[in-house]
Amino acid sequence: MKLLLARHGETDWNARGQIQGQSDPGLNETGRAQARALARRLEETGVPLRRLYTSPQKRSAETAAIVGACLGIEAEAVEGLREICFGVWEGHCWEEIAALWPHSYEAYAADRLRSRPPEGES
């Protein structure tokens, strides 16, 4: 069995450097083009795909729907694939986070596994 992992296409938040977490922006036009390019690349590889799983978030579900439509596979949303919650940091870029929440930012930068954003999860 082979497991292929792919990241969702671009959103406007990605393009602006904003943390998304569990916020739910959809793909922008670049992101939709990236999803179509991914589908073409997967077709070219000839690797048979039997299942397609996605996070239930718009950006991931939309990417998977585009890929699935091209490959003739229906995407299945899995709650366990949802992005972690970045709490009050969501919608902000890293520079803003460092300025607004310096202590929690420094702790997170030093050890992402043992620290968490304010009102977020680790």
Region roles according to the model:
Residues M1-L3, E121:
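Solvent-exposed, charged interface segments at domain starts and junctions
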Residues L3, R7-E74:
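Active-site-proximal alpha-helix that buttresses catalytic centers in soluble enzyme cores
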Residues A69-S122:
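Phosphate-handling substructures
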